[in-house]
């Protein structure tokens, strides 16, 4: 998949999670999902950094919604992209 296709898929999953009435999401989690969705749609951020920002909120939501297949699958995607944000933060620093 190309970059735009990945971003579109990521944003579709965010949209599904945000609008799923069966999920018990906190206000801060919903707010962060909305912020990252807006930033991605305006090209102010990338998938890696959005994954980094969403991870703590969605991890807690997954604990509250253990039976959610949608959230579990999306967490796998988040974990896949999150490590790239860590490398982007660490590599520019001097050792």
Language-model-detected regions and their locations in the chain:
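Short acidic/histidine-centered micro-motifs embedded in hydrophobic/aromatic stretches
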Residues: 32-36, 74-77
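Mature extracytoplasmic domains of secretory-pathway proteins
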Residues: 25, 30, 37-42, 46-49
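Short, charged early-sequence alpha-helical segments and their helix-coil boundaries
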Residues: 42-77
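Short terminal alpha-helical segments
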Residues: 1-29, 34, 86-94
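Generic hydrophobic secondary-structure signal
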Residues: 14-17, 32-33, 40-41, 54, ...
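Short, functional C-terminal segments
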Residues: 69-95
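A structural signal for well-ordered alpha-helices, especially hydrophobic packing surfaces
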Residues: 18, 37-44, 62, 78, ...
């Amino acid at each position: 998949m190309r970059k735009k296709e990945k971003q579109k898929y990521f944003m579709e999953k965010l949209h599904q999670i945000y609008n799923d009435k069966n999920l018990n999401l906190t206000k801060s989690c919903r707010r962060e999902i909305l912020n990252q969705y807006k930033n991605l749609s305006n090209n102010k951020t990338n998938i890696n950094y959005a994954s980094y920002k969403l991870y703590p909120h969605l991890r807690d939501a997954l604990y509250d919604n253990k039976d959610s297949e949608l959230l579990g699958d999306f967490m796998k995607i988040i974990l896949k992209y999150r490590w790239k944000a860590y490398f982007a933060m660490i590599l520019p620093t001097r050792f």
